[in-house]
Amino acid sequence: MEWTDDGIVLGVRRHGESSAIVELLTRGHGRHLGLVRGGAGSRMRPLLQPGNSVSALWRARLDEHLGAYALEGTRMRAANLLGASHATYGVTHLASLARLLPERDPHDGIFERLERTLDDFDTAGEAAIHLIRFELAMLTELGFGLDLSTCVATGTTTELIYVSPKSGGAVSRQAGEPWRDRLLRLPPFLREADEEQSGWSDQDLLDGFELTGRFLLRHVLEPRGQGHSDARAGFINAVVKHQARASAAAISG
């Protein structure tokens, strides 16, 4: 058995004296593990960092076997990602989200979104927006998508500024006003069809994380006996600190 595919490194662990078991999210074969001979050595270490994209050749005698990988780097992002605390936490959290997908089950849409997310992860605010959208996409992929296009109460498609914490449906300004204190806020960057990242505030980011975090916890994590990863909290904290420093610099400058 053998195949070739594009992959993104999610994680690596040592195996024996010199090898490593590498976990990839691949475009056509889903989340897939394989043995990399020599993967524990210093020569391979830069390649096998989470967040890097690779071209993968997988071989095994039988399909159900672990198999062995031969990997070549295609986008070596890790060095840049490790240079910022928000990116370090973010990559770890993204990998934990990808592990919610069944092993060896293709999810090419999630693969494409993960690549786009990692390619635009340098700036803390933009990274936060990408990560929130990734969490939203994961909810959809796992069967718990939120309907943010139409007001769940009236059917209107304008002035959608709230989300019902019960149904996960959008709520318009007028329909939600009497219950505004009980509703979740829908940040503008999740309402825009073209996914433009302009026009957001620090509070919008926090609202976005509250929104996706609530439904991930209820529908995905708690049924598995899990909670949010420490990396998620670390990412949010790093983004908040970065935005505070940026605001202070803008005022003093």
UniProtKB/Swiss-Prot annotation:
One of its GO terms (biological process) is double-strand break repair. Keywords: DNA damage, DNA recombination, DNA repair. GO terms for cellular component: bacterial nucleoid. The keyword Repeat does not apply. It comes from the Bacteria. InterPro entries: ARFGAP/RecO, DNA_rep/recomb_RecO_N, NA-bd_OB-fold, RecO, RecO_C. NCBIfam families: reco. Belongs to the RecO family. Involved in DNA repair and RecF pathway recombination. This is DNA repair protein RecO. It comes from Nitrobacter hamburgensis (strain DSM 10229 / NCIMB 13809 / X14). The lineage of its organism: Bacteria, Pseudomonadati, Pseudomonadota, Alphaproteobacteria, Hyphomicrobiales.
